[in-house]
Amino acid sequence: MQKDALNNVHITDEQVLMTPEQLKAAFPLSLQQEAQIADSRKSISDIIAGRDPRLLVVCGPCSIHDPETALEYARRFKALAAEVSDSLYLVMRVYFEKPRTTVGWKGLINDPHMDGSFDVEAGLQIARKLLLELVNMGLPLATEALDPNSPQYLGDLFSWSAIGARTTESQTHREMASGLSMPVGFKNGTDGSLATAINAMRAAAQPHRFVGINQAGQVALLQTQGNPDGHVILRGGKAPNYSPADVAQCEKEMEQAGLRPSLMVDCSHGNSNKDYRRQPAVAESVVAQIKDGNRSIIGLMIESNIHEGNQSSEQPRSEMKYGVSVTDACISWEMTDALLREIHQDLNGQLTARVA
């Protein structure tokens, strides 16, 4: 690394990582798994476009810090998904990267050992190995697209991705979303602004050229054709924004922008007033709107773990409680199971009219 009076003044170290090609060669997808992921992406695309009447439910831990916990959660989630599949399409949250308002643990890829060692190469390997195990269970997977380089390493394993509230306004992330191979949800801004998400969705649907890395790890000029499978995610802001009036306002603004109204409601964050225990109430309110004839709401997002609440990510790993989030607080598996079964029962036989 060149370091002198003008170059890398604030850089203290440089490590060359394995390339996306090398990671995929070490942890390859089978042809059957490729077909499975392509099929789940199509199912989600059909739901967003109104061709499939089911409700998309992106549900799971706020973040993944322990692969064993993730696998146990996935086994329960898979069994439930099979039981409710006629009206709900369940996709498991597998979030490895966490945007921070200031500082804090940035996720399993960035610091997999949670000790400040920042062993990113190990993080990428742990993440891809876990994703392959989850795909092998037959689960469609969701993530937040945060680092623009990560999709080259892991993007082939995901069926849906989100652009978060802190990055929806970023040109870098809009360009990245235009090239992602799966449907993408855009969250409204942290201030509640709908225009931020709607403009991002419009931008990502267009072709772009930008600098990124290719599968060989080389810096390359990438050209995209645009991503047609975008939708808005209402996550609240200074106040919740999932009421019928809020949903109608989002529909209006999307139509004015020339977009088909297609939106998901995040039951956590601003919509729960940051109280994880309110997520079921938010979900039930949204389901009531669907039962009343709403066709623009295509999905729900729920933060859920094996056990409820959260814990500090700064304590020693040996002292961490099993199955408890180290980022946002989550509802328990028992509450998740009961909620999704209730939604399934409420929507039973009521969704066929939603097909466009």
Curated annotation (Swiss-Prot):
Report if keyword Transferase is assigned.
yes
User: In the UniProt record, does the keyword Metal-binding occur?
Assistant: no
**What does the UniProt record note about how this protein's activity is regulated?**
Specifically feedback inhibited by tyrosine with 50% inhibition observed at 9 microM tyrosine, pH 7.0.
Pathway membership: Metabolic intermediate biosynthesis; chorismate biosynthesis; chorismate from D-erythrose 4-phosphate and phosphoenolpyruvate: step 1/7
* Entry GO terms, CC: cytoplasm
Q: What are this entry's molecular-function GO terms?
A: 3-deoxy-7-phosphoheptulonate synthase activity; identical protein binding
Which SUPFAM superfamilies does this chain map to?
Aldolase
Which reaction is catalysed here?
D-erythrose 4-phosphate + phosphoenolpyruvate + H2O = 7-phospho-2-dehydro-3-deoxy-D-arabino-heptonate + phosphate
In Pfam terms, one family for this protein is DAHP_synth_1
The cofactors it requires, by name, are: a divalent metal cation
Coiled-coil region: none
Q: Which family does it belong to?
A: Belongs to the class-I DAHP synthase family.
Looking up PANTHER family in the UniProt record yields: PHOSPHO-2-DEHYDRO-3-DEOXYHEPTONATE ALDOLASE DAHP SYNTHETASE, PHOSPHO-2-DEHYDRO-3-DEOXYHEPTONATE ALDOLASE, TYR-SENSITIVE
- Name of the protein in its database record: Phospho-2-dehydro-3-deoxyheptonate aldolase, Tyr-sensitive
